[in-house]
Amino acid sequence: MEDFLMKEIDKISEMLGLIATKLGLGGLTIPSEELTQQLNAELAASFDIDIHQLLEMSNPLEYLSERGFSDNAIELLAIMLYQAIPQTEVLNRLIKNVVDYLDNKGYISFMLHSIVG
């Protein structure tokens, strides 16, 4: 049973990677409304997640963990959101919370640390 769960969790990371590649994320990208809409559509289709609802949640990290997102998947999602969504206070707070959450678990994300500064 544990092997099955680990495989399912790994699939989430793989799907996020495929979405990032499909949308051209991974390099330096200037966020645009079109890119935000594309990412939102992909996340809705693949994971039934709405970006705007996620950003408004009181504890989005708990929500993602409950949905089976691994630390790696949470990191990838935060990076994709940073690259696809125009910077707002809410997004910056979410990314800072992701960094703190991962740090507390002993998972260091150099990419997210470089974003937070």
How would you describe each model-predicted region?
Residues M1-N72, D100-Y101:
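N-terminal alpha-helical interaction modules that lie
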Residues D3-F4, E8, F69-L76, V90, ...:
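Structural signature of alpha-solenoid helical repeat junctions
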Residues Y82-G117:
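Amphipathic alpha-helical binding modules
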Residues L61-L94:
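Charged low-complexity stretches with an acidic bias
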Residues D10, M15, L76-Q83, S114-G117:
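"A position-specific structural signal for the A-helix of alpha-solenoid helical repeats
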